């Protein structure tokens, strides 16, 4: 009997579309794989033969339970431990400079300590490029950082807000590092680990820097102000990962080994600054090897506007950014790279007639993506790489037999590729109840008729009459746990 030919030699099987059952399993388990790229917002250019390595060094984290599950699955399928190990290379997106291998073996993060950009590279901005694959050569994809601005050197002039891209705004993230005697090997970074602040030589923390009113009292809750950070102002440093916070601080400009008490210009990238612990007797945030301590400054007898500090109390400040990419193989391993990973930045609801439309704005959208509400696939229309539209499903898709919304129903919004890759968005859509459908229109019309309304990036609300309401996500009150600094 002749063999049955099922396809051309070397032909790849067609991609498996995601099933409702597979989506339900994903929503229950949430075994995501996440790639985090943490980096500074600016990079100092290197001239001639010098190599000014990026500081703090870009860092790649592999987060989520999916990495371990993927490794276990590959080893069950016959891969060796080495073949199931993720591998990564990082570069500055320039073919003239070789990509550098990141050592991820045995841990979920790695830093790229020897990246630099030379003066022969004329770009004013660039993005880091992280290429990832498994040890058996299966491709994961190429992940890009956020945009990084190239600067020649830190500005020594009195900064003005005309150069706003070099200034530091309240509520943004910064890294702080200390370098004794300008030696790269002595660099230590402010970091939180095990519930304590410490000075790490290996990992750096990203801290929200919040501007406070001068009369704001110490407490776990505090009211923050908008605007750019100026020297002499009261600030709060809050770890972006743990929520741990330092006591209220006054940020002061550093000149050589002195803190200037009367400086009031805007804080700029890569400036050296000191942090005075408010309402103390000249105590400053300081490091002593790995410990974070308080250091008491000495008054300058001839210059009352200055206080003498030691090297450990002088910190270099720089703004940081984060690129985050999350994916899950909903129908098992795929042949194509998971990148580009779509990122949703905002939602806008548009309604009319019996149909409510949701517009998604973001990056890396492709025609092979569909929007899902919970375990329901929505009719999706691709516009361009930054915009997609979808039809909001009827409430009956989630609650069988319901003709109108009886109680609030919240469903997650995800994007799904045509080969079963699920991209989590952290967005939810909420159906809000009403007494019942209007007598003069159909149930679907009562549920879905909508007025246009802007929806914040993390939640969308609708009631069954179709009037959509905004949900405020911006709060000026920040809660944190205050860490005590050792004296």
Curated annotation (Swiss-Prot):
Annotated Low complexity bias: 469-487
Region (Disordered): 452-487
Stretch list, region DNA-binding: 44-54, 152-157, 179-184
InterPro entries referenced in this protein's UniProt entry, alphabetically: Beta-trefoil_DNA-bd_dom (IPR015350), BTD_sf (IPR036358), CLS_fam (IPR040159), Ig-like_fold (IPR013783), Ig_E-set (IPR014756), p53-like_TF_DNA-bd_sf (IPR008967), RBP-J/Cbf11/Cbf12_DNA-bd (IPR015351), RBP-J/Cbf11_DNA-bd_sf (IPR037095)
GO cellular component entries: cytoplasm; MAML1-RBP-Jkappa- ICN1 complex; nucleus
Alphabetized Pfam families for the sequence: BTD, LAG1-DNAbind, TIG_SUH
Domain IPT/TIG: 342-432
Gene3D superfamilies for the chain: 2.80.10.50, Immunoglobulins (2.60.40.10), LAG1, DNA binding domain (2.60.40.1450)
Molecular function terms, GO-annotated: DNA-binding transcription activator activity, RNA polymerase II-specific; DNA-binding transcription factor activity, RNA polymerase II-specific; DNA-binding transcription factor binding; RNA polymerase II cis-regulatory region sequence-specific DNA binding; sequence-specific DNA binding
Any GO BP: Notch signaling pathway
Keyword entries, A-Z: Acetylation, Activator, Cytoplasm, DNA-binding, Notch signaling pathway, Nucleus, Repeat, Repressor, Transcription, Transcription regulation
Signal peptide span: none
SUPFAM superfamilies per record: DNA-binding protein LAG-1 (CSL), E set domains, p53-like transcription factors
Modified residues (N6-acetyllysine): 162
Localization per Swiss-Prot or TrEMBL: Nucleus; Cytoplasm
Polar residues biased stretches: 452-468
Subunit structure: Interacts with activated NOTCH1, NOTCH2 or NOTCH3. Interacts with MINT/SHARP. This interaction may mediate the recruitment of large corepressor complexes containing proteins such as HDAC1, HDAC2, NCOR2, SAP30, FHL1/KYOT2 and CIR1. Interacts with EP300, MAML1 and PTF1A. Interacts with RITA1, leading to nuclear export, prevent the interaction between RBPJ and NICD product and subsequent down-regulation of the Notch signaling pathway. Interacts with SNW1. Interacts with CHCHD2 and CXXC5. Interacts with BEND6 (via BEN domain). Interacts with NKAPL. Interacts with ZMIZ1. Interacts with RBM15.
Function: Transcriptional regulator that plays a central role in Notch signaling, a signaling pathway involved in cell-cell communication that regulates a broad spectrum of cell-fate determinations. Acts as a transcriptional repressor when it is not associated with Notch proteins. When associated with some NICD product of Notch proteins (Notch intracellular domain), it acts as a transcriptional activator that activates transcription of Notch target genes.
PANTHER family, per the entry: RECOMBINING BINDING PROTEIN SUPPRESSOR OF HAIRLESS
Family: Belongs to the Su(H) family.
Protein name: Recombining binding protein suppressor of hairless
